[in-house]
């Protein structure tokens, strides 16, 4: 009998080994991918990348908004949220007692969702709220996030689109088994708990989308082009009515139907042994039961849509600036003709040499124009967007866009552009291969869209064989008169509804409790990974050039890409004309090249040149294929010092700038950014220190260019990352980059300083929306101290840094007050400056008071638990142990350290000190540096919808206009 048992075990092991050795691969695959299919249909995509001991993981479920029931739109998305709530084994301290309450909540929602009488609904919701509180007594909030923090995962998140729901983790390479055990339990045994508070978080996400006018345009375009397909019939976030009337039963059925192995792919890129990884995945996911009906469910969607025969014009309204979008139906990403979509996108709009770039943007015929694909699995929408100049109608913009489409159809483009497109695709591929997330995401895209990996590997080679005649023929077949035309107007959206907040009792979170499942995972011993700290003396070089400028050098021995930066110690605070000059030069040619030729040459070389100006320095960046570096450096020199001024171009730029300034006041996020800078730095800040309209009009464009040319006279640091050896690069750059023999030194760190907050006050700026953006900002003038950084890191991790932190639990999990909330003790950019502290939240207008009260409570009486401290410490320690500062990041790390007066990697101090920090030390930090602070409350919102009495109780209210915070 024993022999039979042993034989069975050996046989099972052999079968497992045989299964793990069966995989698909493709010749000449730069990622050397392995693709496995388990017996239950689960797809596993693996690619090894040894850059650092971490692994990017994506678990992709081939289901999204298009698969939502017509009467439960938004379902796939809020199931994504619920997947973080745990299982029967974690997220609970007694599932047997919790389950009857959860079942009762489920049944009440089935009654609630069909009731229309407001009083009846309120009474039922009160029952749901009461039961939810009782159920929370047996739940443990955020145990999934505790698990991820405990194993050192980063980037815990998920996303839902029309075609996929995908779950992301970036894990240490020694935690594969723990990760697999957690995920298999999560995907087989999901439990819906904390439902009504999470639904409020989803609704807050919906509120944020209501001021996203671009989203409205895309959704309207889809509805026109695909009226018989879910792409056009429903949205990923769902309707307001459906979100407020959910069905837990329907969500469970959705999970049962779609979250099955033969509809899922595990996609991984990083440092691992693929044989070991597939064995672990087979161990934990191999017994997952498939659903034989999932293919028929997927195939139930309509395959074709009746094409339009004439333009279908729609109008949408919202707070942002006017624009127009034209859209054409294209084949889906799984179609071979999708190759044409990629190349047409580049021909029309690539940022430099496309038809839109040259004929519309460079020629300043519109404020801005762009084109690109909204590529989906079953169908795609090719979109063009245009924003009008001052006095220009949307119809004028429409005509200009259509004229460029006609040029494409007529073949009125240079055939050599096709070769340049291929070179740029190769450059983009090199960049993607450096990133584990990009590599793993390519797997997700292939799986979701049903694309054979061989086709993906051969994509660039295949596209390179497409001829100009092929493109013209295809363009004429798809760019017909049957297109969607969406006019976006400024105004109130009639489809929006104002919904009052529900009465929610904060649920129990039990931060001090831990389920046995979590305890077992956290106690599992894994082989330690030792940290490797960057050594600036060994991992890079610092040298002085002949003119005493500095060179920071790091060799790229990975691929054929280069990066050069000229960081010039003169910024907008010293010269407010620089920003305008950097913008102006983008429209100009040189003594050798017209503006169009210059941009086309850059694109042909597959390289970039950019000018950016911040308060203390100007950065000129060059990047691209290393084989073309010398040509690009020469082009940049010619551009900087011999740009050909043009009065007409400048006059157009001024007019467009004034229009763009007016438009900026219409965007909620932009308004909040300006409010934040105004309140934190004062009326004179990076945003307001700009030329007035009168100064713009009075400026002589010839004089403006001198501000760029004269940058050569100022001290600069040259940063190089590329294949060239240091001696060779030094000789080359000294010979080919024009600089003064005796550059003028400028004070480093000439930036705007944070304003102290000696007393509480409220600064209120107007914006008419369903939600507020709010920051509580505090500066008690505490100067930077390097020895305080470990405590700061630990406090941020514990208090406000992520989904396992206190802020997330109290504001979102327990109360459903926000989709996004955070708090940070911030480290200044320079050693001369101060630490500051802020909280941040986006919430429905009538939840403002609750948000403020909750922040006050946890800021001044911070819950302190040993288990949460240990998790915060573990997360920091594992993150540092497995992160590697490599490639161009070494140079960035050096600059950051030097700005703080350090000559070493501060991560070493954090790692060595955090491991020994106690709960008492954390509480002492909170008492000394956080508790009892005074704040400036920054609020962007509609005052008519806010509790002004609450604001008055906080401190004096200062109402500021958009004109004040924008400076015009």
Predicted regions mapped to residue ranges:
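Hydrophobic, small-residue-rich alpha-helical packing segments that form membrane-like cores
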Residues: 194-199, 212-216, 220-222, 232-234, ...
């Amino acid at each position: 009998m024993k022999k039979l048992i042993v034989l069975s075990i050996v046989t099972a092991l052999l079968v497992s080994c045989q299964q793990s050795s069966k995989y698909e691969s493709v010749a000449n695959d730069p990622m050397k991918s392995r693709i496995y299919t388990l017996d239950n249909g689960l797809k596993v995509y693996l690619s090894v990348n040894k850059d650092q001991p971490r692994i990017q993981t994506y678990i992709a479920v081939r289901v999204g908004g298009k698969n939502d029931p017509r009467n439960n739109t938004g379902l796939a998305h809020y199931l994504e949220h619920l997947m973080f709530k745990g299982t029967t084994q974690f997220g609970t301290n007694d599932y047997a007692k919790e389950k009857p309450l959860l079942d009762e909540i489920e049944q009440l929602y089935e009654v609630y969702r069909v009731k229309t009488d407001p009083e009846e609904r309120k009474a039922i919701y009160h029952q749901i709220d009461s039961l939810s509180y009782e159920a929370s007594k047996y739940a443990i909030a955020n145990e999934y996030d505790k698990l991820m923090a405990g194993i050192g995962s980063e980037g815990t998140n998920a996303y839902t689109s029309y075609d996929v729901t995908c779950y992301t983790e970036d894990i240490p390479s020694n935690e594969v088994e723990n990760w697999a055990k957690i995920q298999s339990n999560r995907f087989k045994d999901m439990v819906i708990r904390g439902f009504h508070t999470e639904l409020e978080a989803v609704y807050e996400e919906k509120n944020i989308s209501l001021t996203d006018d671009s989203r409205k345009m895309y959704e309207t375009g889809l509805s026109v082009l695909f009226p018989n397909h879910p792409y056009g019939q429903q949205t990923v976030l769902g309707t307001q009515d459906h979100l407020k009337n959910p069905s837990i039963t329907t969500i469970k059925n959705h999970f049962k139907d779609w979250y099955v192995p033969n509809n899922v792919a595990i996609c991984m890129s990083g440092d691992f042994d693929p044989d070991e990884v597939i064995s672990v995945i087979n161990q934990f996911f191999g017994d997952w039961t498939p659903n034989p009906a999932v293919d028929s469910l997927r195939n139930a969607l309509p395959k074709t849509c009746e094409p339009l025969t004439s333009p279908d014009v729609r109008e949408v309204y919202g707070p942002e600036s006017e624009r127009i979008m034209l859209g054409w139906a294209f084949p889906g990403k799984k179609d071979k003709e999708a190759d044409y979509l990629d190349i047409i996108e580049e021909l029309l709009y690539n940022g430099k040499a496309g038809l839109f770039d040259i004929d519309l943007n460079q020629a300043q015929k519109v404020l801005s124009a762009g084109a690109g694909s909204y590529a989906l699995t079953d169908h795609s929408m090719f979109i063009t967007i245009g924003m009008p100049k001052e006095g220009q109608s949307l119809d004028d913009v429409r005509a200009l866009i259509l004229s460029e489409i006609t040029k494409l159809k007529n073949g009125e483009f240079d055939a050599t552009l096709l070769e340049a497109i291929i070179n740029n695709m190769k450059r983009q591929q090199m960049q993607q291969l450096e990133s584990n997330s990009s590599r793993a995401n390519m797997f997700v895209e292939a799986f979701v869209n049903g694309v054979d990996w061989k086709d993906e590997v051969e994509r660039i080679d295949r596209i390179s064989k497409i001829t100009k005649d092929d493109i013209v023929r295809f363009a004429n077949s798809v760019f017909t008169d049957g297109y969607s035309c969406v006019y976006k107007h400024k105004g109130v959206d009639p489809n929006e509804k104002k919904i009052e907040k529900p009465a929610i009792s904060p649920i129990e979170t039990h931060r001090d409790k831990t389920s046995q499942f979590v305890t077992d995972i956290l106690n599992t011993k894994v082989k330690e990974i030792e940290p490797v700290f960057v050594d600036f003396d060994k991992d890079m070089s610092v040298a002085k050039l002949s003119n005493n400028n500095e060179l920071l050098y790091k060799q790229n021995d990975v691929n054929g890409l280069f990066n050069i930066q000229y960081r010039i110690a003169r910024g907008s605070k010293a010269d407010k004309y620089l920003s305008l000059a950097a913008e102006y030069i983008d429209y100009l040619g040189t003594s050798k090249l017209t503006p169009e030729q210059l941009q086309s040459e850059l694109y042909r070389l597959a390289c970039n040149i950019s000018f950016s100006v911040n308060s203390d320095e100007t950065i000129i960046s060059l990047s691209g294929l290393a084989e073309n570096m010398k040509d690009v450096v020469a082009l940049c020199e010619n551009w900087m010092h011999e740009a050909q001024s043009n009065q007409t171009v400048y006059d157009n730029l001024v007019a467009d700038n004034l229009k763009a300034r007016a438009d900026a006041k219409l965007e909620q996020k932009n308004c909040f950014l300006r409010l934040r800078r105004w309140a934190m730095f004062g009326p004179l800040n990076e945003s307001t220190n700009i030329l007035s309209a009168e100064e713009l009009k009075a400026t002589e464009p010839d004089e403006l260019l001198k501000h760029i040319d004269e940058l050569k006279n100022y001290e600069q640091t040259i940063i190089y990352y590329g294949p060239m050896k240091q001696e060779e690069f030094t000789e080359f750059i000294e010979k080919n980059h024009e600089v003064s023999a005796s550059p003028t030194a400028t004070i480093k760190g000439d930036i705007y300083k944070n304003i102290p907050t000696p007393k509480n006050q409220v600064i209120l700026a107007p914006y008419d929306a369903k939600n507020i953006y709010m920051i509580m900002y505090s500066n008690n003038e505490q100067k930077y101290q390097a020895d305080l950084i470990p405590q700061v890191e630990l406090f941020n991790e514990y208090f406000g840094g992520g989904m396992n932190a206190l802020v997330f639990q109290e504001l979102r999990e327990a109360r459903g007050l926000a989709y996004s909330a955070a708090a940070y003790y911030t480290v200044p950019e320079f050693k001369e400056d101060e630490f500051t502290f802020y909280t941040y939240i986006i919430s429905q207008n009538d939840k403002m008071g609750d948000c403020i009260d909750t922040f006050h409570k946890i800021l001044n009486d911070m819950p302190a638990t040993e288990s949460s401290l240990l998790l915060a410490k573990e997360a920091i320690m594992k993150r540092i142990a497995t992160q590697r500062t490599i490639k161009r990041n070494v140079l960035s790390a050096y600059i950051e350290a030097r700005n703080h007066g350090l000559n070493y990697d501060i991560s070493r101090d954090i790692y060595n000190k955090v491991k020994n920090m106690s709960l008492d030390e954390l509480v002492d930090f909170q008492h000394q540096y956080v508790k009892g602070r005074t704040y400036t409350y920054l609020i962007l919102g509609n005052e008519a919808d806010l509790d002004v009495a609450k604001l008055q109780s906080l401190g004096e209210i200062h109402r500021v206009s958009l004109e004040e915070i924008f400076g015009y």
